Structure formats: structure tokens, C-alpha cells
């Protein structure tokens, strides 16, 4: 190949790489002029933070957030085809079997101050890694493993003893065991040099749970280990307990239990285990005292003899792509942030619920802003902070809150009613309503968009053929949906009332007619019902749209709605 052809090939490769980098960088849909201006402002802000950090010893933002913003600036420069001049640093990385002894759970400490408070006055304390796995009870009788119980609700769990022979880390027989031996511990996925600081959760717990709950034998069972963290009614001394556990085939307790005197000791091990290679995934540390009550006193609530100090929840920085507003069944409007997808622990985040319109206005967020998000309880995405705001503030017009309340949008039209109407249908078919199986938002949306449903009860008049006419449903599924619609007819009057939107938590009569006869004063005589609540009930019962639905249900023969009842 001659030199001229090689130059052409090189230019083509460079062009392709540049194009690919720009495509992967998720470039904002801005004009070049705006991109240049926003980039200049972000660069200026980063310089200010950098000066504060190096010259004043101040950290206005966390190091990892700073690094992520530097990376954002780097990608924006690629979008404009500019050479990179940023100094990127790598980012540091429900069962039926009774438990012999209840699983107590752990109280989670918020910070080191809470740890100091808990440690005050206690002695003989030990710290262990808080392993991210599945809690179990092992029961040995005459040395033979008889039960492997899931934690369940702490009192009862499932027996996974059939999986135990395939988990080599769990001894099937212990010659030196006492006549009855009960151990509690964590079944985990064995890892090779796992560093929590770099790799996070690695979806380990879900993998373990899946392998244990499968009816068939999973190959993953052979890769599971166990860490014993409690021996109810066992030796008082942790040293003796660890020695005996090691002799019985459970060596990890001895290897990963360290005596501590102060919170700084705990913090040292917490940091060390967070960064060093370990054979398991962790999400913090557990601090235990040697002196614990007898097993018969343990309850399915956190005991006061052990606590957890988890690692800080990981944060990610992302960009606001758009802002949507949803209207709930009762007319409540919620602001939803659509963000550039980011992965936190094992979960991809694309949307963040930030609450009411008023809350959204307090945040002062528009598309293009850079925010940090983390996972709150139960893995729910949470907006933590607005890190950087774009200079050009796009005007966002939310829905008019005055147009929506508890008695609006029982029908699809007008157009702005569709979100609340869809929420009403989802409630009606859900567990709080008529409890229809496999009938949810997706189905309702399709039926609405194909013109089969315009009112809250139109589905009662649909035939199998009409349902099957919706693209993607088909005859078989249509018949199952139709069966659910027909089964709903047999639901009791109280369920129908809740499905329609009648206020919850109120004792109900057995007929629509008798409910409508009550005055506001009579409703107020009932326990827990004040003036406001009584008026809400009265307005619902006498609303024209609601009465029309009651009349229709009477015609359909639904129990409780006939005037004679």
C-alpha cells in the first residue's frame, strides 16, 4: 500500500473514531453557539472549584462529582470537535417454617456520631463486614443438617434444605456439633478479589436469591459461600465462638471478625474492607457486642446488641433531558424528571419523581441542568442536588392544578383529562379496586387509543372480538382479559365503591341507595369523619358523573347498585 492510500485510510479511521466518540457522548441538542457558551460557563465553574480545593482547602462538591463534571466537559468538547484540555482523573473507584430463633435484623446507623453514641458504655465489641447476600438459619440435629431456612419475616421462612447438598460451603454433617445447633448467617456469591469501592454491588444478592428460590438446581449454587454471624445460645466469647465455628467448617467468621474499642477502630476497618479485595460483596460493616440475650428472647425486630453502619449511598451526576407532569387518580400532579440514564449500584435510572409542582418550582430545574441522584429506601431514585444550572432557562408550563381534583376526569375527554383518566382505570383494576389479573396501564392505554374506552366503565360492554381487535393482543389473551372483566362483576359492593374512587377507610353500607340517604351531619357522627371528610363523601355520592356510573352499574346487575337494594 502506498503512502497516499495510507494517509487516506488514516484520515477515514480518525473521522470514524471522532464520529463514534461524538455519538457515544450524548451531545445536547443545542446550537453550536449555545454549546460553546454553556461549555465556557461550566469550565469557569470547575476552575473556581479547583482553585477553592487546591488553594483554600475547601471542597464545594464531592471529589467524584467533580470528576464526573470534568468528564461531562470533556464529552462536550468532543461534541464540538475540540481537543481535550481537561485533566481527567479516574474515578475511584414468605415462608411457613418457624425459625428456632428469630432473625432480629439490624438498626442502621446514620453516621459516626450515631456509632459513638451506641458504643458508649458497651464493651467486648467486634466489627464484621456486612455481607450483601441472603440471610438464612441453619439447623443441625445430632450433627446432621436438617433445615436451611430463609429469613422470611424473621419468624417464619422457606426451607431451602434441598439446595444445601449443592452448596459445598455448607457442611452437611458436623461430627463435633452439639445435639441441637442453630446458626444464622449470610449466603453469598463467592467473588474473586471483589473491591466494593470500584465494583459496587455487582447484582450479587439478586443472583443468590434467584439460585436459592429456583425449583431446579442452579449451577450457581456451587459458587455460593456462607458467613455465620450469629450463634444463638452459643459460646459467649467471640474468640471461642469463632474457633468452634472454624472447627465445624465455617472459617470466615474467624477471618473477618476484628475487636474494636473506639469508633475510629470501626471506621478503619470499614474503610479497609470497602477498598481491599474481598471474597464477597459488602454494603457496610456490622458492630456486635459479645453479650447477647438468650435466643428465646430474640424478636423479629432489630436487637440492641448489634448495629450496621453502611457505606455512603453512591451518587451519580446526570443531565435533565425533559420534565413531565403526571396527574394521579385524585388529581394530584407530580413532576417527573427525565434524565440521561445513569447506573447506580445495579439499577439504571431514567426518571426521578420530585413531587408536586410547588416542589419542582423550589428546585428550579429545567432541561440541561446537571444534578446528582442516589437511591433512597427500596431503591427509589432520589434527587439530591442541582450541581450546575444551564444559563438559558427553558420555560416549562405545568398543568393547571385548578383543573384537577377528586371529581374530575371520569371520562377521557377533554384531552387534558387523559392522564388522570388513565390513573383512575389503573386504580380500578388494581388490588385496591377490582383486583383484575394482568390488567394494567399498558392494556388500558391501548384500549383508549383504539377508541374502545372513553368512560370509566366502558370496558363492561366490550366483547372478546373487540378486545382481540387491538393490535398485539390476539384471541387467546383477549379471552383471558374478557374473563377478568366478567369476574369483576362478582366483586362485592365495597370493592366497587373503592374502584370508583369512594374515599377509603370508611365503613360501608351494602347499597348505593342507603349511602345516598345519609346527610353530612349523619356522616359526621361516624368515628374519624370530620366536616371536610363528610363533605367529600357527600360530594362524591351526589356528583352527576358518579350517579350516572351508579345507574349504569345498576343496569348491568352489579350487586348493591339497584334502587331496590
From Swiss-Prot:
MF annotations from Gene Ontology: DNA ligase (NAD+) activity
Keyword annotations of the record: DNA damage, DNA repair, DNA replication, Ligase, NAD
Top class in the EC scheme: ligase
Reaction catalysed?
NAD(+) + (deoxyribonucleotide)n-3'-hydroxyl + 5'-phospho-(deoxyribonucleotide)m = (deoxyribonucleotide)n+m + AMP + beta-nicotinamide D-nucleotide
Q: Which family does it belong to?
A: Belongs to the NAD-dependent DNA ligase family. LigB subfamily.
Protein function: Catalyzes the formation of phosphodiester linkages between 5'-phosphoryl and 3'-hydroxyl groups in double-stranded DNA using NAD as a coenzyme and as the energy source for the reaction.
Full protein name: DNA ligase B
Annotated organism of origin:
Yersinia enterocolitica serotype O:8 / biotype 1B (strain NCTC 13174 / 8081)
This protein's encoding gene = ligB
